[in-house]
């Protein structure tokens, strides 16, 4: 990183710290985050998939099947047990996630976390064959739920969040061997489709945005030329959609101005991941224009300042130091008044 770029980031960091210190209760934290699902009240009239009747009513049989699945996840041979393995997830576990009682909906975040840790991550470490099979199966089945408007919004949101968490290579937690997660590239296709879909459910679109952000974030850890990075065309598609969200100042019908600002901030953060290693001139101009625009919401301007502090500027995209420091000073004063 050049000395100019380092100096700019130091100025931005100090300026943003002043802004953050003075904001207090002015910034509203959105409810739609990874651990706070919009479950809402239980409601009738939504589509559900009945879980396998035998496993739902015969405890002994269910425990037997779950024991076999756990053994496979932990390294036992999958060969000869594919039908049972697939059926447990496709006909029992995932259908449970479509139920709409209040208890079922509230349990979705916990069940999602348990599935990722105890099935996906564990299989990735213990049984690559089972992991690969479950990866494809999970993406297929959960994408179907996320894309179907007949399901409860919370059910669809949970499904698209899980799609966004799927990895081709899982992190090696607690093994002492450093392994960064490699998000499942096929899932990114689904995430972008749901993010771009006109009139899509708001919760599904937010879940897709969070998933796209995660893909862009972890893409930065993949070596250039490794063949594992997001294809350029797909990356450009994501950047174009995210930029359009950031530039959309007027909310569509049914969305509040606060909700629109929140969505713009998340899209701006996602772009920060896309440009974390090298800021392009167009993105540098976008950040500077938001920071210096008094008509923009203060929370969005602060997000732009925060993003600017965490990306690397090459010489061609580096904004003038003095004017930018001045804009950040104005932003700090405005936020603290």
Give residue ranges: language-model regions.
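Long, helix-rich interaction regions
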Residues: 31-107, 146, 150-155, 168-183, ...
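Short, flexible loop/turn elements at secondary-structure junctions
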Residues: 22, 161-164, 210
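Hydrophobic core
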Residues: 24-28, 32
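Acidic/histidine-rich, surface-exposed loop or edge segments in extracytoplasmic proteins
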Residues: 93-96, 113-121, 140, 144
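Intrinsically disordered, low-complexity segments enriched in glycine and mixed charged residues
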Residues: 109-113, 126, 130-140, 181-187
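Non-membrane alpha-helical segments in proteins
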Residues: 106-125, 157-166
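Bacterial N-terminal signal peptides that target proteins for export
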Residues: 2-24
């Amino acid at each position: 990183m050049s000395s100019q770029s380092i100096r700019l980031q130091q100025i931005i960091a100090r300026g943003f710290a002043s802004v953050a210190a003075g904001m207090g209760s002015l910034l509203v934290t959105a409810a739609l985050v990874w651990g706070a699902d919009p479950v809402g009240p239980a409601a009738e009239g939504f589509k559900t998939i009945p879980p396998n009747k035998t496993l739902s009513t015969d405890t002994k049989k269910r425990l037997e099947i779950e024991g076999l699945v756990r053994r496979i996840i932990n390294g036992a041979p999958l060969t000869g047990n594919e039908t049972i393995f697939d059926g447990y997830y496709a006909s029992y576990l995932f259908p449970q996630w479509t139920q709409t009682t209040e208890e079922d909906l509230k349990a979705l975040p916990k069940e999602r976390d348990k599935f990722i840790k105890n099935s996906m991550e564990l299989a990735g470490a213990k049984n690559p064959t089972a992991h690969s099979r479950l990866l494809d199966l999970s993406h297929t089945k959960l994408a179907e739920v996320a894309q179907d408007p007949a399901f409860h919004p919370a059910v669809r949101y949970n499904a698209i969040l899980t799609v966004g968490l799927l990895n081709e290579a899982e992190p090696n937690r607690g093994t002492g061997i450093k392994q960064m997660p490699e998000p499942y590239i096929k899932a990114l296709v689904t995430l972008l489709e749901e993010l771009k879909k006109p009139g899509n459910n708001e919760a599904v679109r937010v879940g897709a945005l969070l998933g796209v952000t995660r893909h862009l974030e972890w893409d930065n850890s993949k070596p250039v030329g490794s063949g594992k990075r997001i294809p350029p065309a797909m990356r450009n598609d994501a950047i174009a959609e995210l930029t359009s969200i950031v530039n959309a100042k007027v909310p569509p019908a049914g969305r509040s101005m606060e909700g629109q600002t929140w969505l713009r901030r998340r899209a701006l953060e996602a772009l920060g991941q896309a440009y974390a290693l090298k800021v392009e001139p167009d993105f540098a101009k976008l950040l500077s224009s938001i920071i210096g625009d008094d008509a923009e919401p203060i929370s969005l301007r602060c997000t732009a300042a925060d993003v600017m502090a965490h990306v690397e500027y090459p010489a061609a995209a580096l904004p003038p130091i003095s004017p930018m420091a001045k804009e950040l000073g104005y932003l700090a004063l405005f936020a603290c008044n």
